[in-house]
Amino acid sequence: MSRLAKKPIPYPENVKVNYVEKEHKIVVEGPKGKLELNVHPDIKVTVNQQERWIKLDRPTDRSFHKAIHGTMAALVKNMIKGVTEGFTEVLEIHGLGYRAQLKGNVLELHLGKSHPDIYPIPPDVKIEVKGNEIHIHGIDKQRVGQVAAEIRSFRKPDPYKGKGIRYKGEQLKLKPGKAVGKK
C-alpha cells in the first residue's frame, strides 16, 4: 500500500480539499457533502490547490510509518470518492415472511421473531427498501459498511437453509442436515 501512497492523490474540480495543520485534520468538501479526517501527527500533508492534488509523506521507512501512510492515503481516496459519487451497500433478505419496511426514520425488520426488529436510521445515511433488498447510501464508506453490518446482525444467514440477511453477492456454503443412518 505504501507505494501507492507515495503518488499524489488527484481530486476533481468540484471538490475542495483543505488541511488544518494545527489540528492535523483534512477537510474534503464536494457536491454530496463534507468529510473530515484526523491525520496521524507523523504524516506530513501537502495540498496543491492549483494542480488539484494532495500528497502524504512519511518521516521514515519503518514498517509502522509505511502502514499508517498507506492507511491514510486509502482513507483520503475514499473521502474524495465519497463526496463525489457516494457509496452504496445492498443487503438481501431471504426467508419466508421475512420483510423490511421504512417507517419515517426507522427501519422495521420482520425476521421470523415474535416482534419486529427496529433500527433507527442515522442522519448521515440514507436507506431504501426495494422488495427483498435494502439499499444503504452515504458519503462515508466506513459508516455505510457499519450500518450494513448492524442491520445484517439482526438475522445472519442460517448455515443450513440460508435464511436471514446477507450482502448482495455473498456466497453461502450450506451445511448438510443430519444424515439418518441405517439400523
From Swiss-Prot:
Domain of life: Bacteria
InterPro entries listed in its UniProt record: Ribosomal_uL6-like, Ribosomal_uL6-like_a/b-dom_sf, Ribosomal_uL6_a/b-dom, Ribosomal_uL6_bac-type, Ribosomal_uL6_CS
Stored PROSITE patterns: RIBOSOMAL_L6_1
CC per GO annotation: cytosolic large ribosomal subunit
Molecular-function GO terms, alphabetical: rRNA binding; structural constituent of ribosome
Keywords, comma-separated and alphabetical: Ribonucleoprotein, Ribosomal protein, RNA-binding, rRNA-binding
Leader sequence residues: none
GO biological process: cytoplasmic translation
Pfam family, one: Ribosomal_L6
Transmembrane segments: none
Self-association state and partner proteins as the record states: Part of the 50S ribosomal subunit.
Recorded family membership: Belongs to the universal ribosomal protein uL6 family.
UniProt name for this protein: Large ribosomal subunit protein uL6
Native organism: Aquifex aeolicus (strain VF5)
